[in-house]
From Swiss-Prot:
Composed of 2 helicase domains, a winged-helix (WH) domain, and Lhr-specific domain 4. It comes from Methanothermobacter thermautotrophicus (strain ATCC 29096 / DSM 1053 / JCM 10044 / NBRC 100330 / Delta H) (Methanobacterium thermoautotrophicum). Its EC number is 5.6.2.-, 5.6.2.4. GO terms for molecular function: ATP binding; ATP hydrolysis activity; catalytic activity, acting on DNA; DNA binding; helicase activity. CDD domains: DEXHc_LHR-like, SF2_C_LHR. Monomer. Residues 425-513 are annotated as: WH domain. ATP binds at Q37, K60, T61, D178, E179, V360, R377, H380. It catalyses: Couples ATP hydrolysis with the unwinding of duplex DNA by translocating in the 3'-5' direction; ATP + H2O = ADP + phosphate + H(+). This is ATP-dependent helicase Lhr-Core.
Length: 862
């Protein structure tokens, strides 16, 4: 049963359960317990599962560890502390693991000194175990295991099949999952949930402690953390003190009219604002949504304000930079040496980066929870305000960010979705279970169903994965995919096959697929990585930006690029990076705002009245409200406002007589991707004609030289048939091929590493396509193929909410209004311009939108 913690304990009550040495250390170090600690420590001490959601600087880590350290101290004081693991701390980041080890050193050494003062020798060990741990360190851990083991989800699953170390896990009483919100919504979390159930089966009940940033609904994350006990929901207390920190958030529109302004004016205003914000604060963290955006901001600030910024006081931080450069950036931040750091997503999670007094979000982060998480990196101490500024870049961005601002200030957060019944991850874990020891088939299924992610796993899907692993698809041997387990149906058991099972498992586990990237070296030092596609475009003498610095390309050998430092104007790299999708919940809030605005115009409200409403409702200033007002007014007068109750379908003829149909379906890119592909498939089947698709968060368009019947094709889609139509639309696409390669790697159909050799991503891709074709012809319901389809439709796209949209239309809750326009309506500008991204520079795209805007103004005046 999941319950919210209502009781806050007194300091005296908490000190009474702490070992005297631990209590003494705490009194010397802190004035008092934080709210999170008052709510959680007593129940962790009692062995209850707890999920803590609290802001940065609220003592979350100590909340989890204090009673554990106290219990270990008591065991050591009584001479009962064994040489084995009592607590496992799991985080998604190796850097966070290293932070935690450093942060634990202070209390453990201080408590050790207090004990020594009483003539007692206290040794509580902690250690980090990740893929970076050396063989020497691993050997030491076997002889002297840490009492607190700090690790990652992937390493935990390896330790579960390591025979000698498994014995050291038999005393585990506590598991802490940090940054649980960043694991719960992806396959790393699914993988971890099964590892926790396997650990529970090995050692018996243990206390589960989850630490989370602001997330909704907390009940779902709590269920993900604790799972089930053979059909019954395990108990968990939710400690929610995410409200504690005061928020200082504002939205900045760089110019008075974001459409009428030319690109140079917008660029100048944008960087002047960024410069002023940085100058007014000690340390500023700027978030962009792409790595290319990160590089561009660093380069522009240094080139526009050379007297203020150099390599010594502003740096970039993103996943394509080398580990050494990322660590250098983090260390300089901690020491207060940087004025500003620009990041894409790599600094969102809670690694220790010292004092940040301002966070700037450059353009929409696409969800309220991500905005709060990023802004929460500022004001590290509990009673300091989290200060954030959202700088917008166009009118769609302005509306989106205004709703993010409103929801953030009002505490309305998007829902988290936890993937379920992932058959590739299941295959990996069944193999791991078989390596541990032979299992009863039914008992193994019961243990698997204890995971929240597999609570509804069908027996049919489970047996199909067993069948694949047992080599019952004998034809796969022709493609070098061999049986990994044996199954005895008479005895109802399965177990491992082969002497290399443990090696194969340990070197191929995990859920993060290998990506194509080339190493960039300057003078023998690795400075970062670039995408393979980008490397192929480089010619000798080309210059590009990496880590905020300019390099000249000399040559490439294999997957290594040789460069030298350069100066002058660079070519900003077009990194391959999936854009962040707009959350469905936020999309609906924007649609509701559109509906309210539509009503205001229909009832003839005055400009002043509507302006007052916008400023009050969205918490924005007059400049932002004016741009929003004009944007909606133009759309209303020209074509009508699409909203939660009305989907506009806009027909117009473009350059050279090309036909366009724009669907104003503001439901986020993931929903629109699903619907648009299904519509395009129906058109192709009906008219034997391929159509061009362009998809955004705000809608999608179809384009063709001739008749398409787009609306007719859309009306053919029903809630009941969308999944089947989309399944057919996805077959033989690069999207499915890519996802199948990832799933086949997780399910160990494609071995990324074998006997010390690593298979390149290129070879994996080729092998994936061969296997996809083979299994499609062998059995259309092959479990890993089914999983690849599920991943595309449910995780990459959002078919569930796409079906909801079709239900609204079927039930009459949303009407479809067809319109014909000479020029695309204002709400369609960005979507239409997006289709020209490959042939238009950014400045030309802005100019294209400005010209369309002027044409609309002229049309309205007629």
């Amino acid at each position: 049963m999941i319950k919210k913690q209502e009781r806050m304990y007194t300091s005296g009550e908490i000190h009474s359960i702490l070992h005297p040495w631990v209590s003494e250390w705490f009194r010397r170090t802190f004035d008092d317990f934080t709210e999170a600690q008052r709510y959680a420590i007593m129940d962790i001490h009692r062995g209850r599962n707890v999920l803590v959601s609290s802001p940065t600087g609220s003592g979350k880590t100590l909340t989890a560890f204090l009673s554990i350290i106290s219990e270990l101290t008591r065991l050591a004081d009584d001479g009962e502390l064994e040489d084995s693991v009592y607590c496992i701390y799991i985080s998604p980041l190796k850097a966070l693991d290293n932070d935690i080890e450093r942060n634990l050193e202070e209390p453990l050494s201080a408590i050790r000194d207090i004990a020594a003062g009483e003539g007692r020798d206290l040794e509580i060990r902690k250690a980090v175990r990740t893929g970076d741990t050396t063989s020497y360190e691993r050997s030491r851990m076997l002889k002297k295991p840490p009492h607190i083991l700090i690790t990652t989800p992937e390493t935990l699953s390896i330790l579960l099949v390591a025979p000698k170390f498994r014995e050291k896990l038999s005393t585990v009483r506590y598991v802490i999952v940090d940054e649980i919100h960043s694991l719960a919504d992806n396959k790393r979390g699914v993988h971890l949930s099964l590892s926790l159930e396997r650990l529970q089966h090995l050692v018996g009940d243990f206390t589960r402690i989850g630490l989370s940033a602001t997330v909704h609904p907390l009940e779902r994350v709590a269920r993900f953390l604790v799972g089930y006990s053979y059909g019954s929901e395990r108990e968990c207390l939710i400690v929610d003190v995410s409200y504690l920190k005061e928020l200082d958030i504002d939205l900045i529109c760089p110019v008075d009219d974001i459409v009428a302004a030319d690109p140079e004016e917008i660029g100048n205003a944008l960087y002047d604002i960024l410069h002023d914000l940085i100058e007014d604060h000690r340390t500023t963290l700027i978030f962009t949504n792409t790595r290319s955006g990160t590089e561009s901001v660093v380069y522009n600030l240094k080139s526009r304000f050379p007297e203020s910024y150099s390599d010594s006081n502003i740096m970039a931080h993103h996943s394509s930079l080398s580990r050494e450069i990322r660590l250098e950036t983090e260390e300089k931040l901690k020491r207060g040496e940087l004025k500003a750091v620009v990041s894409s997503t790599s600094l969102e999670l809670g690694i220790d980066i010292g004092y940040i007094d301002l966070v700037v979000l450059l353009s929409s982060p696409k969800s309220v929870s991500r905005a709060l998480q990023r802004i929460g990196r500022s004001g590290h101490q509990l009673h300091q305000r989290s200060k954030g500024r959202i700088v917008v870049v166009d009118r769609d961005d302005l509306v989106e960010c205004s709703l993010i601002l409103k929801n953030a200030l009002e505490g309305k957060i998007d829902s988290i979705k936890v993937p379920e019944n992932c058959l590739d991850v299941l295959a990996q874990h069944i193999y791991g279970m078989a390596i541990e020891n032979p299992w009863d088939i039914d008992h193994a299924l019961a243990v698997i169903r204890n995971s929240y992610c597999y609570r509804n796993l069908s027996r049919e899907d489970y047996l199909s994965v067993l069948s694949y692993l047992a080599g019952e698809y004998v034809e796969l041997e022709e493609r070098y995919v061999y049986a990994k387990i044996w199954v005895d149906y008479d005895k109802n058991q399965f177990g491992k096959r082969g002497k290399l099972a443990r090696m194969l498992y340990s070197t191929n586990i995990g859920t993060i697929p290998d990506r194509s990237a080339a190493v960039v070296k300057c003078g023998g030092k690795v400075v970062g990585r670039i995408e393979e596609d980008f490397m192929e475009k480089l010619r000798k003498g080309d210059t590009f930006v990496l880590g905020g610095r300019i390099y000249r390309f000399n040559y490439a050998r294999g997957m290594t690029v040789n460069v030298t430092p350069a100066s002058g104007p660079p070519t900003i790299p077009s990194w391959f990076s999936e854009q962040l999708p707009l959350s469905f919940d936020l999309a609906l809030d924007i649609q509701r705002f559109r509906d309210i605005m539509d009503g205001k115009f229909q009832y003839g409200r005055s400009r002043d009245e509507i302006m007052e409403f916008i400023m009050s409702y969205l918490h924005v200033d007059e400049r932002a409200a004016s741009s929003i007002y004009e944007y909606f007014r133009e759309q209303y007068l020209y074509a009508g406002i699409p909203s939660i109750r009305r989907m506009l379908v806009e027909y117009y003829t473009g350059f050279g007589g090309r036909k366009f149909i724009v669907f104003h379906s503001l439901f986020g890119r993931r929903v629109n991707d699903a619907i648009s592909r299904a519509v395009a498939y129906v058109i192709a089947r009906r008219y034997r004609r391929d159509v061009m698709i362009s998809v955004s968060d705000n809608g999608f368009y179809l384009s063709s030289e001739g008749k398409m019947g787009g609306l007719e094709a859309f009306r053919e889609l029903e809630p009941e048939n969308l999944r089947n139509v989309l399944k057919k639309a996805l077959d033989r696409t690069e999207t499915l091929a890519s996802r199948f390669r990832h799933c086949a790697g997780r399910a160990l159909m494609i071995l990324r590493r074998y006997r010390g050799e690593e298979k390149s991503v290129g070879r994996q891709q080729v092998r994936g396509k061969i296997l996809l074709k083979f299994v499609s012809e062998l059995d259309d319901k092959f479990p890993i193929l089914e999983e690849a389809r599920r991943e595309v439709m449910e995780d990459y796209m959002d078919i569930e909410n796409a079906i909801r949209v079709l239900e609204w239309i079927r039930d009459g809750d949303m009407e479809i209004k067809q319109i014909n326009t000479r020029i695309p309506s204002p709400f369609a500008f960005n979507l239409v311009a997006q289709g020209y991204l490959d042939v238009l520079k950014y400045e030309d795209r802005i100019e294209f939108i400005r010209r369309m805007h002027q044409a609309i103004i002229d049309e309205i005046k007629r």
